């Protein structure tokens, strides 16, 4: 790793998790000008959890909780506003096919189909069987 202010290289510490992490996406709370504090959250596809990276620059992951969905190694998410803002994720549970739009809880990790009161997952899909791979998602706040 490189310190962007000084240019000095830093050796990362030992990763200390029961299962090696497979971080497929990350998002910050309070990611806007003038903020005094921020928290980095990650999606770990090996454990299917929302994790907090604490401290952000050390790469230490603390599990927040299970997503309740299985990730196949692809996904994207963003947090609009502060810690109580909109947390939106596009996740793919199969090896191919469409992504599904979810909201995530920053306190429990639980994924809920986005604005879908019927429970019909097809109403929250992005793309079809050959739809595009979602690499990033951004919410304008």
Where do the PLM segments sit?
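Structural signature of eukaryotic scaffold interfaces centered on beta-propeller domains
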Residues: 19-37, 71-84, 133-141
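Short, structured patches in soluble enzyme cores that scaffold and shape functional sites
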Residues: 3, 27-30, 42-44
